[in-house]
């Protein structure tokens, strides 16, 4: 979702909404400012929640789902800037917290490799898919892409993929959140 917005928001605003290039380019600034504040805020919130980083991430993903609906519906420049600021705030929190959560699940001597693997897979699948395939699907001059017998074409299909990615991400975070909760409760019992 991050790369889908980061790379394609200006193009979406120009193609689908008929914006000027100047207004469309500014979308990234608002997204990135939200990202900076979101990374700091979600990290701080997860500390307040006593290390429940995946729970924070799940909360962010649920809110992000509804903000993505807004993103697909708003047409005015300042409404879009606001939505993209909020999306940046929401998207980058889980991205940061996933990397931090990894630390709690592996031995110290495997931290760098584990963090590297999560980053590698995020970029191999998320970044590559969003850059290549979302662009191909959204491109009005192309025929779209066949996936599981469905022809995905246009911005509506692009949003469908982003919604699907959020659902999958949220579902994948649930077992990690449950394991994290178990670790937190065990540590609490040991300290009593």
Mark where each language-model region is:
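Extracytoplasmic gate region of multi-pass secondary transporters
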Residues: 1-42, 95, 99, 126-134
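Hydrophobic positions within alpha-helical transmembrane segments
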Residues: 27-31, 114-118, 158-161
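Helix-to-loop junctions at the C-terminal end of transmembrane segments
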Residues: 39-51, 138-139
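Paired intracellular helix-loop junctions of major facilitator superfamily
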Residues: 50, 102-112
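C-terminal transmembrane helical hairpin of 12-TM major facilitator-type secondary transporters
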Residues: 52-101
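A membrane-interface helix-boundary motif in multi-pass transporters
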Residues: 53, 136-166
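Multi-pass alpha-helical transporter architecture, strongest
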Residues: 71-72, 155, 159-192
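A late C-terminal transmembrane helix in Major Facilitator Superfamily
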Residues: 108-142
């Amino acid at each position: 979702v991050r790369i889908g917005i980061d790379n394609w928001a200006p193009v979406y605003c120009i193609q689908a909404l008929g914006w000027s290039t100047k207004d469309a380019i500014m979308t990234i600034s608002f997204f990135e400012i939200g990202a900076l504040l979101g990374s700091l805020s979600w990290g701080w919130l997860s500390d307040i929640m006593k290390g429940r980083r995946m729970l924070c991430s799940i909360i962010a993903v649920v809110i992000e789902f509804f903000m993505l609906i807004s993103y697909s519906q708003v047409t005015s420049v300042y409404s879009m800037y606001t939505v993209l600021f909020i999306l940046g705030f929401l998207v980058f929190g889980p991205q940061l917290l996933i990397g931090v959560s990894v630390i709690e699940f592996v031995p110290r001597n495997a931290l760098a490799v584990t963090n590297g693997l999560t980053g590698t897979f995020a970029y191999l699948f998320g970044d590559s898919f969003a850059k290549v395939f979302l662009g191909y699907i959204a491109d009005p001059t192309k025929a779209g892409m066949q996936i599981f017998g469905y022809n995905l074409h246009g911005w509506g299909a692009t949003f469908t993929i982003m919604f699907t990615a959020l659902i999958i991400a949220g579902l994948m975070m649930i077992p990690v959140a449950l394991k994290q909760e178990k670790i937190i409760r065990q540590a609490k019992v040991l300290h009593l």
